[in-house]
Amino acid sequence: MSSPLASLSKTRKVPLESEPVNPGRRGIRIYGDEDEVDMVNDGQDSEEKISLPSCYGGIGRQGLMIHDSELLTSMARKLQELEQQLKARNEEMLSKEQKILALEDLVQTLQQHQSSTTREEELETQCIQLQRQVGEMERFLNDYGLQWVGEPMDQENSEGKIISESDERDWMKAKKFWKPGDSIVPPEVDFDRLLSSLQDLSELVVEGEAQVTPVPGGAQFRTLEPIPLKLYRNGIMMFDGPFRPFYDPYTQRCLRDILDGFFPSELQRLYPDGVPFKVSDLRNQVYPEDGLGPFPGEGRVVGRQKIRKVTDRVEETSGSRMTAEKFLNRLPKCVIRQGEVIDIRGPIRDTLQNCCPMPVRIQEIIVETPALASERQRTQESPNMPVPPLSMLRIKSENGEQAFLLMMRPEDTIGDVRNLLAQARDMDSAAFEILSTFPPTVYRDDTVTLQAAGLVPNATLLLRTRRVLPANPSFGTDSGPGSLP
């Protein structure tokens, strides 16, 4: 066994050129009994190879193994730190995604709330408007001494159901073929009670009594005529038609008003103070609802020679039908609203001319008079004041194509009427005469008042070209109203 001094005296071996040398490290090779150890210089990051004697055994290998374990530990620690950072980033991203989803839900909720708020405001506005309309209608009913009673909810639903079903039915199915509604028993009507109620209502209004009717610039008296009303087993017919079956909601409403002791609400506008009824009790007859009237020709029975008229159906509707002229005569000629004279019959006449044959229309001309101007001013300033006594004159022209409407005072004279007509016609007042047919009278005295001439409250007069009277004294000119020459 050699001593340490002997090992130091050995010659250092030079490394071979084939072995790669890292320029960044300076290796120290230690030799000793053919043992070599590579040591790393941490200060210069260079590897040095130092040859150690064999007496040091495996010291170099142990140092290299320690360095590798530290490197692995460091790499594992860094990898663990990176994994923790990645996990933290993932958790942060998930948290941000949840916040984004929550914000999106909040935005959607706010948008829905905004739309619902707008809808609530619209509904509130509509509710306020409907409440105001209901209040106005209740005040209107109170003005006539009426009160809204209402209807049961189930009855309203049934009426709406009937209306909707009738709208959906085809004409052929409704008029020609059997339908499920035909098997339903119509509502029972107490005819005796209905006739008694109609009689009581007619007694409230005296037949032939004059009522105040609005006319241009004021009002006039009009004689009431009873309304014809026919009672059939399956419905009623008011005026000259159309036929109204009992299952119709509007007919039921009309009958309900009568049975409750009120005039039908549908007649309120035309007859605000009521109207008498002329009832025809035809409860034993059934009015045909198929729209087919009696066969107009003659029929033959098979196997017989006898010719007979088909008259075994319901009786023909008696009386003349409602013509357009009759309908227009039931309407007021004109009304005054806010100081303006509004023609009522004119626009309706123009509409009816497209569908109904109308006679030659008479042009109605409203003449501006002092009484009309004062009445217009009164309606604007103090409409609640009573209407003063007035006289409404309707004067037809010579050819009958024009009719002049004049609102006059009872103290106005014939001369005032003549001057107003001459001014409206743009002609001389001496070129025409004013006369009445019943009694036949010519109004030549211009100083006579309308009250003295019997032209109050209204009258219908005619115009004619002035005639030259002969010189015979027996046909002298009257100083006032006289008989026709």
Curated annotation (Swiss-Prot):
<dbReference type="GO" id="GO:0005737">
    <property type="term" value="C:cytoplasm"/>
</dbReference>
<dbReference type="Pfam" id="PF00789">
    <property type="entry name" value="UBX"/>
</dbReference>
<feature type="modified residue" description="Phosphoserine">
    <location>
        <position position="483"/>
    </location>
</feature>
<keyword id="KW-0597">Phosphoprotein</keyword>
<dbReference type="Pfam" id="PF08059">
    <property type="entry name" value="SEP"/>
</dbReference>
<feature type="domain" description="UBX">
    <location>
        <begin position="386"/>
        <end position="463"/>
    </location>
</feature>
<comment type="subunit">
    <text>Interacts with GNA12, GNA13, RND1, RND2 and RND3.</text>
</comment>
<keyword id="KW-0963">Cytoplasm</keyword>
<comment type="function">
    <text>May be involved in the reorganization of actin cytoskeleton mediated by RND1, RND2 and RND3. Promotes RHOA activation mediated by GNA12 and GNA13.</text>
</comment>
<keyword id="KW-0206">Cytoskeleton</keyword>
<dbReference type="InterPro" id="IPR029071">
    <property type="entry name" value="Ubiquitin-like_domsf"/>
</dbReference>
<keyword id="KW-0175">Coiled coil</keyword>
<dbReference type="GO" id="GO:0043161">
    <property type="term" value="P:proteasome-mediated ubiquitin-dependent protein catabolic process"/>
</dbReference>
<dbReference type="GO" id="GO:0005856">
    <property type="term" value="C:cytoskeleton"/>
</dbReference>
<protein>
    <recommendedName>
        <fullName>UBX domain-containing protein 11</fullName>
    </recommendedName>
</protein>
<feature type="coiled-coil region">
    <location>
        <begin position="67"/>
        <end position="143"/>
    </location>
</feature>
<feature type="modified residue" description="Phosphoserine">
    <location>
        <position position="479"/>
    </location>
</feature>
<dbReference type="GO" id="GO:0043130">
    <property type="term" value="F:ubiquitin binding"/>
</dbReference>
<feature type="domain" description="SEP">
    <location>
        <begin position="224"/>
        <end position="288"/>
    </location>
</feature>
<dbReference type="InterPro" id="IPR001012">
    <property type="entry name" value="UBX_dom"/>
</dbReference>
<feature type="region of interest" description="Disordered">
    <location>
        <begin position="1"/>
        <end position="26"/>
    </location>
</feature>
<dbReference type="InterPro" id="IPR036241">
    <property type="entry name" value="NSFL1C_SEP_dom_sf"/>
</dbReference>
<dbReference type="InterPro" id="IPR012989">
    <property type="entry name" value="SEP_domain"/>
</dbReference>
